Every structure is written in C-alpha cells, then in structure tokens.
C-alpha cells in the first residue's frame, strides 16, 4: 500500500493506533508493530510514518473518547455511524458545530473535537483503505463548504494574539494549542488540486508560515532546549506542520522538478540538442571582442566573466592574474581605444607565455570605458551575436547574479548618472522580483521569503541548536536501549566477531556469515531490539522532530534557489554559520557514545542506523528482526542531511575544505556499506566535494570510492575535479569569492528590505566584523576596491525604507525625473 499525498494517514496506521488504544502496552513491555517503512520510503518529502497519527491524535483513551463525542453526547439520538448518515444530516451537523465555534468556551472544545474526528476520516467507521481515503476527501470538502478551516485559523490567530508569555505552564492553553494544530494539519495535509482553495489559504491574513515560525521561536525560547518538555510539548507538532505548510503552499518535490524543467525551457529556447552549447563565459568573451570594434555591445555588458567550472560563483576562481587587479574597475585594463593587454617584460619561454596569455584571455575581467559614439553594426555581426546568445547555456541563477552584480557595480562607481540618470534610477528601483513575477508559485515563494526575512536568522539558529541537542539525546537513548537487552548484546558481539580477524567465530555467527543473505528492503536494517515503551516513545518523538527539521531545511533551500539564488545563498550561509556541518558530523561520530558502545559490545556505531548494517546483515534468516517504523525515518533523516550538506558546500571551496578537515569522509565511508542506492548516491556526492582536498595517499587507498563516484555522479570528461590548484592561490580565490558573495547578498537584502535589516544587526555582529576585516584586507592587497559600508552593512543608519533616495540625496541629486 503505497504512501501518497492523497492518503494523509494510512488505514493500517489507524488500525495500529486503535490497537494501541484498546490494549496499551506495558511501560516495560517491548512494543512491536508491523512497520510500513518500504511504503513510506517510496515518497521522500510526502511520506507519512507510523507515529504521525499518534502525533496529531494523542494515543490515550481520554482523547479517543473526546473524538467520538458526537456519538455519545451530541448525536441527536441517532444510532448510526458517520458513514451511514445522509449528506443533509452531515451538513446539518457541521453547521451546528460551526455555530458552536463562535459560542462560549464550554462548547467550543467539544465542537473542535468533533471536527477533528470528521477531518480524520472517521476511521473507526470505515472498513477498507479506499473507504478511508474517500471519507477524508468527502469530509474535508464538507468542512470547506462552511469555511470551517478559516474559522479554525481565526481562532488560532486570536489565541496567539492574546496568549501569555508563560502559556506552556497552563495545561489548558497547551491542550487548546495542540487541538488547533491538529486541525490545521488535517486541513493542509489533504492534497487538493482546487486552485481556488489553495489561493484562499495563501491569502490568509496574517500569513500561515511566518505565524507558525514566530510561534516556533517563542516556544523554543521558552523551553530553552529542555528535551524532557519537548517530548511532551506541541513543538514536535509545530515543526512538522511548518514543513507540511511549505509542501502544500509551495509544492512537493515532483512539482518542484516540473517547475525547474519549465524554467529551463524558457531560458534555453530555440536551442539545438545536436549541437554543443557554449557557456556564459564564452558569450562574455565574444561580447568583449565585439565591443572593441563596435561600442554598442558594451551598453548592457557585464564586466566580470563567469568561471567555467562553477557558473554562478562570482568572481572568477584560481587565477593569479585576476588577483592583481580589482574586479569592479581598473584603469590599466583593455579599452576600445587600446584593446591590447599589458605585456609582461620578464623573460619567459614561448610556451609559458602562450599559456599565460591563454589564461589571461579566459579569466581577466574585461573592464573598459565604453565609447559613447554610436557606430553602425553590420547585420552579420548582429546575427552572429543572436545565434551565439541562443546557443549559450544559461541558468536562472546566472541571470539573477549577473543582474544583481551589475546593479552593485553601477551604483558603486556611480557610472552613467549624468549621461542617463533616469534609466539608471529605473534599473535600480525596478521590480524586486523581476525573474519570478510571471509565475504565481514563485511569486508566492518570494512573498513567503519577504514575510520570513525578519525571523530567518533567529529561526535557523534555534532550529539548528534544537537539531543538535535532539540528535545527541537520540544517540544516548539508542545506547541505553542496546545496554538494556542481554540477548541483543550477544547478537551484536557475535556479529562484531565476524569482522574481527583475531577472535574465533561462534557457530551461529559462522552459519549466518555462510548464508550471506542480501538485504533488499529497508525493514532489514531496522533497529530490531526489544526496548521499553518509554524509550520507544521518546525516540519516536525526537526522531520525528529531526525528520521535520531536516526536510524543512531541504525544502527551503530548493524553493529559495528557484525563486532567487541570493535567497538560497543566504539560507546556506546561515546553516553554515550555525555549524550544521559540524553538528551532522558529530551526530555521525558521537565520540562518547562510540567509545561506550565499542567497549561494551565490540561494535563501532557510526550514528543514526549505520550500526544496523553490522548487526543484521548476517542473521536475517536465523533470528527474526522486529521491524520498527523509526528505521525509515532514520534513513530519510540521513538522506535529507546529506542533501542539505551538499547544497550548502557545493559552491564554496572553503566549505569543501572544512569537510575534508573535519574527517566527515570517514563517516561517509561507513554509510556506503549500507545497501541502499539513494543513500549511497548522496554520500558519494558529499564525498566528491572533499576529494580534491584529501591527500594523495587517501586517493590511492580509496580508488574504489573514486570509481563509484565516476559511475554514479555526473562529472565532466576531465579529471580536474579530483585535484585543486595551488594552495595559497586557491585560498585567496575562495576568500575573494566568499567576501564578494556576502557583499552581494547583503546588498540584495538592503535594496529590498531597507530598514528591516537594522533589526537583524544583533544576529550579525560577528559576521559584519569579519566581513569588514576581509574587505579591508582585500582592498589593501589590491584584490578588490573598497565598497562603501552603506551598501552592505545592516548597522548603517537609514532614515526610511527609501534607501536609494537617501543615497541620491547625499549626492545632491534632487530631481530624479
């Protein structure tokens, strides 16, 4: 039974919940459920897990009886189930609940519980999975007819506005919040193709996403990362609900891929698949060559070309000749009057001179002062330029970075103000989201980013801290669970002996090794050991928060990059600055737990579920494994973290080098031993980033890993990805790249949000100090010109949001028109 977006909760999961409620497990009795990890694994971002219904429908008899309140107290003496009621009776009942929502507090909660039971599909009155899915769709549609979702959201906004600072200490307020979050979950979980309904949810005021994020920040700050409270609080519901809101209002993974494909077709129209495409750098070189003869080509031309390897990184990398000049302007570079480059007077060989000339032509910024005289351009040159532009391989990120970099350059140098001030002012004050306004989904994503911008820094900081503390707690709980079972301890010891060349194999271990059974499904590396109900409940709740946060990070990175690349770079920078890389590496390593486990059970556990590969890959036939749903969550958590890590470090040499220095590659090698194709692929992609910065001895000793990277990862035909340039030059290039990109990110946000950036200064004090020091060092070494602090500093005083009007006033320019 595959997990789909339409089946928000599977029928089998409801049956397990009902079984749990009817016959609750003892506190110290092992909990065994038939997991659905294989079904859940089929859809990454839209998968649903065994504890999801336990998350939004508390597994206890009191809550269950409240869900059935309409049958006992308010059923108008009708002795029939919900499924057997007529459509008019259902509508009258929902209308009655709608009236009660606006009445006193005594009846409001009972009406909300009844609506929650209806929205959950009335699972105790249906007999099959198909009936359950149909019941959910029908009931939610009826609730929408009477605007029940909007009414519930208005109650949530009213409660959020009037809540006290210490509302978590009040069990009544916390229970009411859990009830409202559960209702919002069921209303947003059901997949709906009705554009009117989606538009109504997007147009709610205040918006849903920033409201939930602000509540998440308040709850996390109040709890102060007390994990004992997190387990029993509404924070786990809230974190998953934020992720679910992003899916429903932005789009799922499949919809994201369709949107990316559509944008690619728009940007590469009239291109031929039989002929090779040129790069953006080739087109810039062509424009420079033409501009030396025909100045009209220099009108809207970008002075800094893009690098061939990483097309959206600015400025170029690994070029010593580039470092000897500024990337914004330089008087010694070529011009239309004198297009020849400076010739080195030092005696060099013919081959080295030719190589130096080629490198200079490919990487030197072609900056020059355009000739204002209008010359006639031959038709053949214009036609060649159009064909070349159509054959140029471009991406949305390249176009956005080129545009933003041109604005920064023009405003920094104050060029063309006298010649054509009105045109320059319109370009600077143009539409903020010129690349995504044509698409309604990207426009809404941009609006969501605008709403989230004041809370983004604080939210990412608290979310990453919460991820760290929860992952550390989960590892400790797993070690405690290992230590609580003597039988499992013996099994681990036997399997640890299998990998040891010095110890003798037991009969059971030898027989298991001889069978050499291949693992095919996710259930085979489930954490199949007997644990108490208390530990199982804690692990399920904590892992659910880990899955929600990792999925949310991945979803935001993907959609923000599609809307604007600088939003993606800002989020990636926040994750990097809050040490997500180190936290993930520590979670895989977990030094203290590793030593304890190795001492007790002779098995080094690599974190998450990598220990399962050593535990169960030999004894699947002889000893039955108790499957648990958390194994699929662990699998998806790991893949999400690997994908987030790859996106954060993919375009930064400094971050790639940190991966190599942190010995993360040793933990990734352990993940390659787990027989799962997707997990191996994402682990290989992260390993590919760190390979150039690893030593030659490591490469020679791990040629099998490099071979797997060649076979599974998309690479160019050359082998340059395995090696990096000269160490000092690479570091200087990376430093220049990081500094310029940070300036560009800040310039973009200051241009759009103006005075709002002032409130973020307290979160960016250290960042601004480091950036200011880097700019001064690069300017002193003539690697770049000093950029005014008003263009990138959040602490710069601005009287109003009209930032550029103030800058024009400072230059004594009053009449823009």
Curated annotation (Swiss-Prot):
Subcellular location: Vacuole
Primary location class: other
Keywords: Cell cycle, Phosphoprotein, Vacuole
Sequence positions bearing Phosphothreonine: 502
List of residues that carry Phosphoserine: 500
Keyword Transferase: no
Keyword Cell cycle included in the entry's annotation: yes
GO biological process: asymmetric protein localization to old mitotic spindle pole body; cytoskeleton organization; negative regulation of septation initiation signaling
GO CC field: cytosol; FAR/SIN/STRIPAK complex; fungal-type vacuole; mitotic spindle pole body; nuclear envelope; old mitotic spindle pole body
InterPro entries assigned to the protein according to its UniProt record, in alphabetical order: Far11/STRP, Far11/STRP_C, Far11/STRP_N
Biological role stated in the UniProt entry: Participates in the control of the reentry into the cell cycle following pheromone treatment.
PANTHER family noted in UniProt: AT25231P, PROTEIN REQUIRED FOR HYPHAL ANASTOMOSIS HAM-2
Family that this chain belongs to: Belongs to the FAR11 family.
Name of the protein in question: Factor arrest protein 11
Species, as recorded: Schizosaccharomyces pombe (strain 972 / ATCC 24843)
């Amino acid at each position: 039974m595959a997990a789909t977006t339409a089946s928000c909760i599977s029928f089998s999961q409801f049956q397990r919940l009902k079984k749990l409620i009817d016959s609750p497990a003892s506190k110290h009795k092992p909990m065994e459920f038939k997991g659905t990890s294989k079904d859940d694994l089929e859809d990454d971002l839209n998968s649903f897990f065994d504890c999801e219904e336990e998350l939004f429908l508390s597994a206890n008899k009191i809550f269950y009886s409240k869900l059935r309140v309409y049958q006992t107290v308010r059923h108008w003496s009708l002795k029939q189930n919900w499924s057997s009621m007529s459509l008019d009776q259902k509508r009258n009942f929902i209308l009655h609940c709608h009236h009660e929502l606006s009445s006193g507090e005594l009846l409001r909660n009972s009406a909300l519980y009844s609506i929650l039971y209806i929205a959950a599909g009335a699972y105790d009155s249906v007999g099959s999975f198909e009936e359950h899915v149909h019941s959910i769709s029908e009931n939610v549609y009826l609730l929408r007819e009477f605007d029940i979702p909007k009414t519930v959201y208005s109650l949530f906004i009213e409660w959020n506005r009037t809540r006290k600072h210490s509302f978590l200490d009040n069990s009544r307020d916390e229970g009411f919040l859990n009830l409202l979050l559960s209702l919002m979950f069921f209303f947003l979980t059901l997949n709906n193709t009705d554009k009117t309904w989606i538009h109504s949810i997007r147009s709610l005021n205040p918006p849903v996403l920033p409201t939930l994020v602000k509540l998440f920040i308040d709850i996390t700050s109040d709890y102060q990362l007390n994990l004992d409270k997190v387990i029993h609080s509404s924070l786990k519901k809230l974190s998953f609900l934020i992720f679910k809101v992003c899916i429903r209002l932005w789009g799922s993974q499949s919809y994201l891929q369709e949107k990316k494909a559509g944008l690619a077709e728009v940007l590469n129209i009239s291109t031929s698949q039989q002929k090779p495409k040129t790069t953006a750098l080739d087109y810039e070189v062509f424009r420079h060559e033409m501009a030396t003869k025909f100045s009209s080509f220099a009108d809207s031309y970008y002075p800094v070309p893009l690098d061939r390897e990483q097309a959206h990184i600015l400025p170029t990398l690994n070029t010593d000749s580039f470092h000897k000049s500024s990337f914004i302007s330089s008087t010694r570079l070529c011009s239309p009057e004198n297009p020849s480059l400076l010739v080195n007077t030092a005696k060099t060989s013919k081959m080295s001179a030719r190589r130096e000339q080629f490198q200079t032509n490919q990487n030197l910024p072609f900056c020059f002062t355009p000739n204002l005289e209008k010359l006639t351009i031959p038709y053949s040159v214009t036609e060649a330029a159009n064909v070349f532009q159509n054959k140029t391989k471009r991406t949305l990120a390249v176009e956005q970075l080129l545009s933003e970099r041109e604005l920064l350059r023009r405003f920094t140098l104050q060029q063309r103000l006298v010649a054509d001030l009105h045109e320059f002012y319109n370009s600077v004050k143009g539409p903020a989201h010129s690349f995504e306004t044509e698409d309604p989904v990207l426009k809404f994503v941009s609006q969501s980013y605008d709403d989230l911008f004041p809370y983004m820094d604080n939210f990412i900081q608290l979310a990453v801290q919460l991820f760290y503390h929860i992952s550390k707690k989960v590892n400790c709980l797993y070690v405690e669970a290992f230590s609580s079972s003597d039988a499992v301890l013996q099994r681990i010891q036997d399997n640890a002996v299998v990998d040891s060349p010095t110890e003798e194999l037991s009969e059971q271990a030898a027989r298991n090794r001889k069978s050499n059974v291949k693992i095919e499904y996710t259930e085979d590396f489930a954490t199949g050991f007997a644990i108490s109900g208390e530990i199982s409940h804690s692990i399920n709740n904590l892992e659910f928060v880990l899955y929600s946060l990792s999925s949310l990070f991945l979803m935001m990175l993907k959609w923000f990059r599609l809307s604007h690349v600088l939003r993606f770079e800002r989020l990636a920078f926040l994750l990097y600055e809050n040490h997500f890389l180190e936290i993930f590496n520590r979670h895989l390593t977990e030094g203290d737990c590793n030593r304890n486990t190795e001492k007790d059970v002779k098995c080094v556990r690599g974190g998450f579920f990598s220990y399962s590969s050593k535990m169960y890959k030999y004894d699947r036939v002889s000893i039955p494994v108790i499957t648990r749903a958390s194994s699929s969550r662990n699998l998806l958590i790991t893949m999400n973290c690997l994908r987030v890590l790859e996106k954060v470090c993919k375009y930064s040499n400094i971050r790639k080098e940190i991966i190599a220095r942190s010995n993360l590659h040793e933990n990734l090698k352990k993940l390659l031993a787990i027989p799962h194709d997707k997990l191996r692929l994402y682990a290989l992609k992260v390993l590919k980033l760190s390979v150039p910065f690893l030593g030659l001895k490591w490469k020679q000793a791990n040629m099998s890993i490099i071979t797997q990277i060649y076979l599974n990862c998309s690479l160019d035909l050359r082998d340059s990805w395995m090696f990096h340039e000269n160490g000092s030059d690479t570091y200087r290039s990376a430093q220049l790249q990081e500094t310029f990109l940070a300036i560009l990110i800040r310039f973009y946000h200051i241009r759009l949000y103006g005075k709002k950036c002032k409130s973020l200064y307290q979160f960016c004090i250290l960042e601004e100090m480091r950036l200011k020091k880097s700019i001064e060092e690069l300017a002193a070494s003539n690697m770049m010109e000093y950029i005014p602090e008003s263009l990138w500093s959040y602490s710069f005083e601005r009287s109003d949001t009209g930032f550029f009007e103030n800058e024009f006033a400072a230059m004594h320019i009053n009449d823009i028109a």
